A protein has these predicted regions:
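Feature activates predominantly on carbohydrate-active enzymes
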Residues: 1-206, 250, 257, 275
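Substrate-binding groove of N-acetylhexosamine-processing glycoside hydrolases
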Residues: 8-17, 51, 91-94, 100-102, ...
Length: 432
């Protein structure tokens, strides 16, 4: 807490005297920085965050890297993903230590490895799309390489091994080669093998705890009946730390406002989506000028709100106007509304690129080019389709006559709409 105390002193330099006292309730407190969602933060950006953490009095930074760190003799691991080199990790580790912050490797040794396992070179250790094949010697030789890299580049002995959300464990190549085995037994045996490697390297491991719950209950994450008998459950080594995570369960009242966003159709909601985003845009427009350090971030969200104020319910209005044969409204949409959205979207994309290239390595930004560039192109195509209908080149817009169906039916849990699932009813790989 030295740097937190120093921060308070600096803010009271003009005071003759001041007194402030805090009680520490956690031995360790910090942040997990996700560097596996395509954007790998630059070393300088991580150093900036380390300074912020120090000022806040935190002493742990977990670096979450599924395949975005260098491993000797594994060139496909993290290929074209902007992975941290060994020297970069050592530089971050040394810098963190200067501020009393422990840099903890947070890796994956079972699931969440789809970016690595997609390569044919990695097929020999693949169980299913993103899960390593348990019980196979080549798998543990590979994991040993991962842990040796961790041992050599991080000064801490603590390591987070991941192992969460491996719901298809043992149901891929393992099933075909060895037959069925209970998930609870597979996770225990796999943990034991990885624990042996950790012990040999002097590492103190922890994992996410959900798989021990899921494998024993065969239910959802942390779905355990109140009267469950846990006495016969497969249990982990007592030296293996279990880390609890759960953002699926809470009081339903906390989610009531959010659930409205997943209604069958925006039209079914009483919320004026356009006005909602317009209000956000107005607020952010004021904030953009208030922060020199974070002004660009505010500008991005300002433009995002501007885009959504026009686009969020655009499809609803287009279909309504088409169904009612209100051609003047369609003309207004194609000639004014869509061009305005495109203008805001292009500026939003420019700002997002500037933020990315400032904060992260360039790898991965190409996917935002595809996504946002695709939205821009689709808006232009939509405008042309409407114009062709209005000037008589086509007699109907068949895509607007298709009955609208909800992605999630009423019987299903309504969760996020994923771009790859809702951008089309067709499959990208089947396109001629």
């Amino acid at each position: 807490h030295y740097y937190r105390a120093l921060n308070y002193v600096l803010h009271h330099m003009e005071d003759k005297t001041f007194q402030y006292q805090e009680h520490i309730y956690f031995e360790r407190n910090g942040l997990m920085l996700d560097c596996s969602r395509n954007a790998v933060f630059t070393v300088e950006k991580v150093k900036f965050l380390i300074r912020i953490l120090a000022k806040l009095g935190m002493n742990v930074l977990m670096l979450y890297t599924e395949d975005t760190y260098e491993v000797k003799s594994e060139p496909y691991f993290g290929a074209y993903r902007g992975k941290y080199t060994r020297d970069e990790i050592k530089e971050i580790d040394t810098y963190a230590a200067m501020f009393g912050i422990e840099l903890v490797p947070c890796i994956q040794t079972l699931a969440h490895l789809h970016n690595a396992l997609k390569w044919p070179e990695m097929s020999k250790i693949r169980d299913s799309a993103d899960i390593l094949q348990p019980g196979k010697e080549e798998t543990y030789q590979f994991i040993e390489k991962l842990l040796i890299s961790v041992k050599e580049n991080f000064s801490t002995s603590r390591v987070h091994l991941g192992m969460d959300e491996a719901v298809m464990l043992g149901l891929g190549n393992s099933l075909r080669e060895n037959g069925y085995k209970e998930g609870s037994l597979l996770i225990r045996e796999h943990c034991e093998r990885v624990m042996d490697i950790c012990k040999a390297l002097g590492l103190k491991p922890m994992i996410w705890s959900d798989m021990y719950i899921t494998a024993n209950t065969r239910g959802g994450y942390y779905d355990v009946p109140e009267n469950a008998d846990c006495s016969q459950w497969e249990k982990p080594d007592r030296n293996l730390g279990l880390v609890y995570w759960d953002y699926y369960h809470d009081d339903i009242r906390d989610y009531e406002k959010m659930l409205g966003l997943f209604d069958y159709h925006v039209k079914a909601s009483s919320t004026d989506i356009k006005a909602y985003y317009q209000e956000i845009y107005n607020c952010l427009s004021e904030d953009c000028t208030k922060s020199a350090k974070y002004g660009l971030v505010f500008s991005f969200y300002e433009k995002l709100a501007a885009v959504l104020s026009g686009k969020a319910d655009l499809g609803v209005h287009i279909k309504d106007a088409y169904d009612r044969e209100e051609k003047e409204i369609l003309k207004e949409i194609s000639q004014n509304e869509i061009p305005d959205i495109i203008c805001n979207l292009e500026e939003m994309k420019r700002i997002r690129e500037e933020i990315w290239m400032t904060d992260a390595k360039p790898f991965g930004y190409e996917l935002l080019d595809v996504k946002l560039g695709g939205v821009i192109t689709r808006l232009k195509s939509t405008g042309r389709r409407i114009d062709n209908y209005l000037n008589g080149k086509v007699s109907r817009l068949e895509e607007l006559e298709e009955t609208r169906l909800p992605y999630f039916t009423d019987e299903m849990d309504k969760r996020e709409n994923r771009w790859d699932r809702i951008t089309s009813g067709c499959d990208l790989n089947d396109t001629i």
